Amino acid sequence: MALYAFDGTGDEDTDRVSRDSNVLDFFRAYDGGPKNEDPSLRIGSLYLKGIGNRARSFVGDRPAQAFGVGGHRRVRQALDRLENNFETGDSVVDVIGFSRGAALAVSFANELAGKCPRVIIRFMGLWDMVGQFGAPGRRFNAGHDVSADRAAD
């Protein structure tokens, strides 16, 4: 069993933030990993920084924050990790997300429902989902399926 954790817009796991996000706290507590552990080193489970985090600049990537750019890459990362886990017999997953990360969590779950029907989503925790990608007010959502009807069973 593994956790796939999608953090919110601008959120990340660095010392530059004053407080860890709920997603990061949940991820670190999930299987007892130490608080100071680098989330990218965890085997099985996966923590994904929020869209538009400060990796590129002090203030973050404003266009990514505004339009949700980079979401497909994060979903692909999660699918790649799941594929590796599945090959070792892991077919039960938990998924969490906050803000746009919650929308990415739903998009990830919908990808699983369509492509990997043998994978079981045991738990899905979503905080304050922002299901908007691309230009504001459009229904297109840059190719993300953020409807919960396929993801929930």
Listing of model-derived features with the role each one plays in the protein:
Residues 5, 17-42, 58-65, 69-75, ...:
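Surface cap/lid and interfacial helix-loop subdomains adjacent to catalytic sites
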Residues 7, 97, 101:
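Gly/Ala-rich beta-loop-alpha elbow adjacent to hydrolase catalytic centers
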Residues 39-42, 46-55:
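A conserved beta-strand->alpha-helix junction
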Residues 8-11, 51, 130:
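Active-site glycine-rich loops that stabilize anionic/oxyanionic intermediates
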Residues 12-14, 55-58:
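Short, solvent-exposed loop/turn elements at domain surfaces
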Residues 1-11, 15:
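N-terminal low-complexity, Ser/Thr- and acidic-residue-enriched intrinsically disordered segments
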Residues 46, 93, 97:
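Short glycine- and Lys/Arg-enriched binding-loop motifs that mark or flank ligand-binding interfaces
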